[in-house]
Amino acid sequence: MKHVNTLLMQELRLLICELKRLRLSAVSDPDFSQEKIHAELDSLLCKLSRHFD
């Protein structure tokens, strides 16, 4: 079980990094559309939900 928890924590850290990158892109890149933000968030939610479904 400890191995599973470690893998989950690694995955959560990666998702947090991706969310920070998305936030930075959304703020700093004028060509970053709402549709792209929604697509990125949907992708991250799918990755996260794999662990809890």
From Swiss-Prot:
The UniProt record's further free-text remark is:
Gene K overlaps genes B, A, and C.
Give the protein's function: No function has yet been ascribed to K protein.
Q: What is this protein called?
A: K protein
